[in-house]
Amino acid sequence: MLKNVVLCFDQLRHQPGTGDDTNATALFGLLDQSDHQIGWYHAGSPRWARQRDGLTDARASVGEAYTFLVRNFEPGDRVLVFGAGRGGYCAQALTRLLGTVGILPPRWDDLVDYVVCAYGLPRTRRTPREWALVAALAAELNDGDDSTIAVTYLGLWDALRPVALPKPPSAPLSNVRAGRHAMAVDGGPFGDRLVSACSDRVEQVWFRGGHCDVAGGAGACEPLTGIALDWILDGARAAGVVLRTDDTAVSPAPDQTDALAGSARSVALRRLPSDARLHASIDVYLRAHPEYWRRLPDRVVWSDQDWLARGERLVPAAATPAVVPAELAAAS
């Protein structure tokens, strides 16, 4: 039976339901898990900022996800990968690993640690030519067939790399079919570096707020977090992700009030490139706070301009009260 295999990498271990949930936690909680869709979640590690422990823990996270795929993936399944903050770094590492060596047969699961260390998160950088040689070797071991696995959708919220962890390869993620990366205009934690998604199939859009406002977590402005979650969910639905529809499943339905929430944080601002793609919710904020233009490039491209209409479609319509004709009311 063909199915969706959804993998979610969070950025920092926390207790779910305490108000510190990130968008990765929220998305995982919204998944409709069944025989047709299974999910895996990793809560992240507080040690990723330290070089020795950080690389070890990042490899362990990617290794757990890869092992889940080895044990559960079947040919024809769709793989969808999500990551928030530092979890976005691991999400891209797993995606690159799938595009290089694919998924090992279950009988080789004892090689997972080696594969992750050598080809997922190596200590030294490899050239594009070296990555191509690795892919060719993997195909040869697979009886000459292409062993790469496509990632149907890659969803990222302000993906970060702690300076202690190695830079990801610059070669494009050619196995990604579609994706979205929500990035924070107003910067992120000191010392971490924004990790751009190396694929022209991943739409990268800037959102108002700091890192926690886009990725979620402690100190986040929840209305802004909901806007970024809604955008990633919209792409996930289009890619085939099935979300719960029961009464306890609450998907975001942002409106103009949400776009005006919070204040412009004075944190480590990021320099946006010319013609940066901005989420249309920023335009709502600019009308009320034109001084925010100082943080933006001279030329921008507006993205997701129907976001308000999408929110209205997700909100159940209120019941329209019946209008009783005056003559009937008088007769009664």
Predicted regions and their residues:
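Active-site- or binding-pocket-proximal scaffold segments within functional domains
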Residues: 1-332
